[in-house]
Amino acid sequence: NSGVVHGGFAYDRGSLKAKLCVEGNKMMGDLAKELDFHFIRCGKVLVGNTEEDMETLKRTMEQGKDNGATNLELIDEKRLHELVPAVVGKFAMFSHNSGIVDPFGYTIALAENAHANGVEYHFGCEVTAIRREDDDTYEITTTKGNFKTRWVVNCAGLGCGKISDMLGITGYRIIGSKGDYIILDKRTGPLLPMPVYPVPSNSYMGILVTNTTGGNV
């Protein structure tokens, strides 16, 4: 949602999410050129102040290295101020390979590329039932007719729990949480050349401040 391209250090060791994050990060520069969307490899900092913060950052950095993430560096207050003058902190972990992307342009570029390669879109087409056939294909019932397919990819966002239920994979529920974005004027853009995060907790990455490819904060 924020348009941040992560470095792969924040995810559990050996997880699929970590693997795909590191691989996707490496691909992003070439992909941006090929599909013509905005991407800036500007880096990212996780800012800390306490001894506990430092220990957490060290663990985070080691986890990142185990995941294959590269160019991770612990920096002192002076170096942090040089990178992001508007941020106050005693130290930080600097992820050189992190960056930002225009999430709207990126999504549209992927959709256009998929369409050019034969993908068909059916908008306003709600899935109401899915039945697995004896030949291991699926009959998908929608508000605009039925479809038969060999594969079903569940990417229904907030509705993915309902799709899972239709496939007999029960027990997954999406617990929604509301987030607010405050967009500042482009005059503030020079104050923040890269995304800034607090030291992560066990539950989430925290509230961030980030620059955008359009020059806002």
Segments predicted by a language model, with ranges:
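Helical element adjacent to the flavin cofactor pocket in flavoenzyme catalytic cores
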Residues: 93-151
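Glycine-rich FAD pyrophosphate-binding loop
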Residues: 1
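General beta-strand structural signal in soluble alpha/beta enzymes
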Residues: 73-76, 121-123, 154
